[in-house]
């Protein structure tokens, strides 16, 4: 029993602990979502459609603030062909939220995009960080 306890204590010491944030900053999750604008069978998502999506879906979900960037991505498909696509990149800094909570908050937004614009997926990235204002 003592040996098992000793091993557990050693393993606990190896577990990663979050680094302390600098003075004036606190723990946050940074979330990014990449919304592709190509739509099969029709013209790409327009700027007006994006603005409407922001007003109706994104802003109510994240009223404290966000950043949107224009992006242009590419990937190689199964046939080896490079496909390119314009996108909108949504960046969220969510103070005091862990990655699971951030993912849960963002999921309805990405689901709405996929449904509205017949998208297969929305790339999402979550990472821990520090934020201060």
Question: Where are the regions that the model predicts?
Answer:
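Mature extracytoplasmic domains of secretory-pathway proteins
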Residues: 49-87, 93-100
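Bacterial signal peptide processing site
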Residues: 15-17
């Amino acid at each position: 029993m003592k040996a098992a306890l000793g091993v557990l204590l050693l393993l606990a010491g190896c577990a990663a602990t979050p680094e302390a944030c600098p003075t004036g900053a606190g723990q946050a999750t940074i979330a990014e979502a990449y919304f592709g604008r190509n739509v099969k069978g029709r013209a790409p998502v327009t700027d007006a459609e994006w603005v409407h999506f922001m007003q109706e879906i994104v802003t109510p979900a994240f009223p404290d603030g966000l950043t949107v960037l224009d992006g242009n991505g590419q990937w190689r498909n199964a046939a080896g062909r490079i496909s390119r696509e314009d996108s909108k990149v949504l960046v969220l800094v969510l103070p005091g939220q862990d990655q699971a909570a951030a993912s849960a908050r963002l999921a309805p937004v990405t689901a709405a995009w996929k449904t509205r614009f017949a998208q297969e997926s929305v790339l999402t990235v979550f990472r821990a960080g520090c934020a201060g204002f």
